[in-house]
């Protein structure tokens, strides 16, 4: 389950405890004793006692680094979505409809012949644009442009609620720009970290060569990127520090950025980001942004071009030919995550379509799979658990009356979202063309960026969802004090529409309680 903190920190905690057909649900809506290991005394190892049978019956598949009931449901959910999208392919869908766009994007992702024939051609226009940069001004403009459709270079830019005025959206810039995800992988000297660094450099060399670099050129480009990312990582704050809101809030006037952060072409950058009239923002982590600016000012244009090119190549790799995909998996799947086998193309493509057009897929999904009555059943469960939590708060001996009053107030004002949004996102301005899988993923990213930048300076939309309805997960958002349970998780083994209350409290009830307690982290 997920605690969503905006704009850029997402803390995910997935619960591994472990509706499409009533018959299937009825066969599961009771305690399955075969999941237990009754050869072990509960007092000796309750975990083994409670899950030993399930573990023995469900060995970790080669394509996973971890595996639990959550993952089983996610796989089943993907089968549902595949069935839905395959059905779209048998219909004549109006041009420009969500059904046509979803089906068209999925077809491009599944067309291995075209993907392998195209090779690196789909990213050639972006790489040529970067290669044409003549000076640092061009680099700043490209940095902004790339961040609209690829992994943020140098530092990130987003729009989200003001932590100290949660009803208003403001701009935030924050640490970003590293390809291995965590600073420790760049800095620690243990054998595993050194292995990852070597593997990451090897990945970059391979992918640069796939785009046409010579062997020597690819080696130099990879070294340039690694130098920049290591310097960025050295300035990045730790995961632990990012969890402390007071250390990640530095709101200031744009006119003060040169003095309080670093001299930079801020006006040019914000204009390129579509925020020319920006007057204030939050700099979540000052030192990493300062370090990024220092790199841009110091390094030659050619070195910065290699870095920006890598951001494009690495972001696009999963949507290109098999040589890109396989090299990407060797590092991100095997070395970094521990997976042994690449997931089937159809599963990867469904994930991509969900990411690109989440609510479009979600609208089709709930029409086919989610009964409206489930909302009412869930509301009853949530209300009962809120009451129970309120009673526990009132009985806490270690909490003073003033704090109890504040806690009860927060509990009483939880916004509860169940199943799917009341208003669906409008995808009419998003074009899905037949040119390439990657170019459509670019358009989808740029569409989402446009949706985000349109919220700048406006009140927070309390009706907005931060997960698509088909997602097998849930979240709590502190900025809006809301808990959300998408339709995707409201299926066995978490939720049974016609099941006994005891089964539902032991399944989705755990998830509800988990998200509620995030409100009191």
Task: Place the predicted regions along the sequence by residue.
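C-terminal motif of bacterial Sec signal peptides marking the signal peptidase cleavage site
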Residues: 15-18
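Hydrophobic/aromatic-rich, well-ordered segments within soluble, folded domains that form packed cores
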Residues: 35-56, 190-209
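Active-site-surrounding "flap" and adjacent substrate/cofactor-binding loops of secreted or lumenal enzymes
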Residues: 41-44, 49-114
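Structural recognition of the beta-strand scaffold that forms the well-ordered cores
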Residues: 45-49, 170-172, 482-486, 519
């Amino acid at each position: 389950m997920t605690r969503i903190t905006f704009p850029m920190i997402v803390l995910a905690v997935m619960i591994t405890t472990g509706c499409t057909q009533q018959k299937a649900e009825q066969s599961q809506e009771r305690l399955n004793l075969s999941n237990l290991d009754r050869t072990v005394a509960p007092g000796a190892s309750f975990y083994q006692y409670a899950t030993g049978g399930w573990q023995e019956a469900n060995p970790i598949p080669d394509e996973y680094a971890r595996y639990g009931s959550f993952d089983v449901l996610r796989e089943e959910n993907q089968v549902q979505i595949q069935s839905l999208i395959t059905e779209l392919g048998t219909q004549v869908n109006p041009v420009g409809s969500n059904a046509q766009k979803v089906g068209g994007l999925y077809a491009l992702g599944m067309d291995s012949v075209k993907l392998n024939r195209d090779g690196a051609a789909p990213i050639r226009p972006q790489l040529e644009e970067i290669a044409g940069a003549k000076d640092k001004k061009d680099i700043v403009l490209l940095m902004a442009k790339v961040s609209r459709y690829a992994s943020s270079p140098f530092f990130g830019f987003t729009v989200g609620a003001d932590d100290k005025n949660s009803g208003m959206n403001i701009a935030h810039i924050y640490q970003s720009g590293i390809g291995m995800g965590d600073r420790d992988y760049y800095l620690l000297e243990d054998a595993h970290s050194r292995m990852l660094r070597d593997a990451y450099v090897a990945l970059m060399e391979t992918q640069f060569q796939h785009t046409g670099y010579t062997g020597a050129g690819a080696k130099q480009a990879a070294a340039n990127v690694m130098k920049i990312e290591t310097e960025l990582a050295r300035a990045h704050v730790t995961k632990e520090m990012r969890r402390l809101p007071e250390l990640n809030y530095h709101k200031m006037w744009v006119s003060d950025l040169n003095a309080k952060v670093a001299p930079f072409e801020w006006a040019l950058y914000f204009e390129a980001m579509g925020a020319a009239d920006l007057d204030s923002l939050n700099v979540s982590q000052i030192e990493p942004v300062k370090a990024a600016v220092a790199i841009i000012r110091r390094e030659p244009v050619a070195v910065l071009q290699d870095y920006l090119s890598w951001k494009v190549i690495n972001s696009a790799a999963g949507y290109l030919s098999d040589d890109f995909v396989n090299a990407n998996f060797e590092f991100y799947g095997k070395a970094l995550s521990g997976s042994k086998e690449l997931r089937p193309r159809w599963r990867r493509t469904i994930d991509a379509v969900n990411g690109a057009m989440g609510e479009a897929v979600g609208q089709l999904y709930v029409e086919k799979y989610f009964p409206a009555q489930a909302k009412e059943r869930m509301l009853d469960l949530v209300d009962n658990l809120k009451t129970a939590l309120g009673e526990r708060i009132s009985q806490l001996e270690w909490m003073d009356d003033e704090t109890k009053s504040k806690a009860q107030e927060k509990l009483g004002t939880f916004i509860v979202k169940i199943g799917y949004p009341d208003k669906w996102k409008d995808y009419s301005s998003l074009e899905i063309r037949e040119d390439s899988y990657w170019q459509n993923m670019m358009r989808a990213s740029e569409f989402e960026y446009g949706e985000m930048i349109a919220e700048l300076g406006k009140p927070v939309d309390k009706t907005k969802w931060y997960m698509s309805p088909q997602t097998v997960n849930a979240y709590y958002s502190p900025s809006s004090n809301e808990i959300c349970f998408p339709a995707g998780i409201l299926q066995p083994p978490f939720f049974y529409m016609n099941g006994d209350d005891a089964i539902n409290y032991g399944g989705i009830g755990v998830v509800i309680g988990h998200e509620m307690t995030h409100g009191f982290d």
